[in-house]
């Protein structure tokens, strides 16, 4: 009875806070879009399915990471009341076909989850990203899915005390296409906006992702050119940001045209610009360990990695891809994989006051690993050696086995999507990303 009362009270408080926050946020930031009232869809049915599937996985990940029961309830309520409500139609047939195919994951599931071990922290932070999808996205009434993101973003205010949308508003104008930009004939994806949440004890930090391909096509420019112009027009783009951007763009453009890494995604933290980051994501088709080090240091322009850091990165590389950890492995490319998301993904972070970018690499284990079982065992061993695990000393492998409830880890590849690594002060930080595979595997 006390638990039920507490849950009801939490929902009442959440609803009240959300109503106030939406009105305040929408007024303060003058959102240009309004949501249409749709009929003919049993929305509550689809919301319930999203919550029972991904909401339950989110709680499992939080519990395994050591979050309190109150924290789990707080973030589960937000997911159900705000995020699940923003994911559109839940897939009920397999293979799933939808009018809107999200670029978030390879099977188009519009949510990706992660555990993040920062530096020497023993247990991870839980994070997730979502692409809000309107009920009629991809149809004539909402061809570019322009209606869902605004409401979801506004609803974050009660749990995001540091929310600041100045940079969001700036880049929304520069990087997102709308119907007025004309025809959008492309064989690539139509996704343009993702929202991400880093979960603290009783709050969260919001991040926003822009995929500017449609806007670039409309403007007749490359993604990199569009990102560059939008950053340089930013009022807070100080000399350090400009210098950092110049280092990055010069390095990328120095590649031969057919080998040039391609800019794909741009992201900001929705916090005070003085504390925010500008993140440019680029994909390279080169897949050797040596090429990874080359990209991470921008050809040696950023501070050199220490020998210990390089050894740690090589150990992680071999663990993720089931390769022998010896010197010869560094020059051998991973097996050939012709896929839209093949190759290695990097992000380069620009900050006010920082004259050089910092980097992170995303290892696409879903393409180059053997099975999810092999990947989980490899990363589990790597983390264990560094004193990193889940709550109560539970191994990463056992944690992944528990959250992947719809199939055996040995029976497929793709539940773990990326293993990322970044080096800060000589210490390697690792994140593991998961695709719930909702659009690929039946839960029935």
Swiss-Prot record:
What Pfam families does the annotation carry? Answer: Trp_DMAT (PF11991)
Could you give a GO molecular-function term held by this entry?
Answer: transferase activity, transferring alkyl or aryl (other than methyl) groups
Disulfide bridge partners, by residue number: none
**Catalyses which reaction(s):** L-tyrosine + dimethylallyl diphosphate = 4-O-dimethylallyl-L-tyrosine + diphosphate
Main EC class the enzyme belongs to: transferase
InterPro entries attached to this UniProt entry = Aro_prenylTrfase (IPR033964), Aro_prenylTrfase_DMATS (IPR017795), DMATS-type_fun (IPR012148)
- A GO biological process held by the record: alkaloid metabolic process
Induction entry: Expression is positively regulated by the thioclapurine cluster-specific transcription factor tcpZ.
Task: Please state the Enzyme Commission number of this protein.
Answer: 2.5.1.122
Write out the entry's keywords from A to Z: Transferase
Free-text function comment from the UniProt entry:
4-O-dimethylallyl-L-tyrosine synthase; part of the gene cluster that mediates the biosynthesis of an unusual class of epipolythiodioxopiperazines (ETPs) lacking the reactive thiol group important for toxicity. Firstly, L-tyrosine is prenylated by tcpD, before undergoing condensation with L-glycine in a reaction catalyzed by the NRPS tcpP leading to the diketopiperazine (DKP) backbone. Afterwards the alpha-carbon of tyrosine is oxidized by the cytochrome P450 tcpC to form a hydroxyl group.
Similarity section: Belongs to the tryptophan dimethylallyltransferase family.
Complex and partners: Homodimer.
Q: What is this protein called?
A: 4-O-dimethylallyl-L-tyrosine synthase
- Species: Claviceps purpurea (strain 20.1) (Ergot fungus)
